[in-house]
Curated annotation (Swiss-Prot):
Phylogenetic placement of the source organism: Bacteria, Pseudomonadati, Pseudomonadota, Alphaproteobacteria, Rhodobacterales
Any GO CC annotation of this UniProt entry: periplasmic space
Role according to the record: Monoheme c-type cytochrome.
Organism of derivation: Paracoccus denitrificans (strain Pd 1222)
Keyword Translocase: no
Pfam families tied to this protein: Cytochrome_CBB3
Protein name, UniProt field: Cytochrome c55X
Keyword terms: Electron transport, Heme, Iron, Metal-binding, Periplasm, Signal, Transport
Gene: nirC
GO molecular function per UniProt: electron transfer activity; heme binding; metal ion binding
Length: 103
């Protein structure tokens, strides 16, 4: 019985959360500007990291980009953000980058 209770608690934490709410989206936009921008440039046009503008990412898949966000890129300075972001957060950021034009 204790095992079943533990399993139910663990599964409850893995339920599909869905897209981030408006407040979390604001936090993620801030993270993109501050944290991603520190390497990819304030306009995401490149710096230490490669450009991540919508134009530079054209043709990339949301799932592929979210995997890079979560797991980083071995052999580069790109860290994995899995300890801080959910998969839904990473997909939202990937979609945001693919659709947002920088000025």
């Amino acid at each position: 019985m204790a095992r079943l209770a533990l399993l139910l608690v663990l599964l409850a934490g893995t339920a599909v959360a869905g897209p981030p709410d408006a407040a979390r989206q604001d936090e993620l936009r801030h993270l993109v500007r501050q944290d991603c921008g520190s390497c990819h440039g304030l306009r995401m046009t490149g710096g230490l990291g490669r450009p991540i503008t919508a134009a530079a990412l054209a043709g990339r898949d949301v799932e592929d980009l979210s995997d890079v966000i979560l797991d980083g890129m071995p052999g580069t300075a790109m860290p994995g953000w899995r300890p801080l972001l959910t998969e839904d957060d990473a997909r939202w950021i990937a979609d945001y980058l693919l659709k947002t034009e920088t000025e």
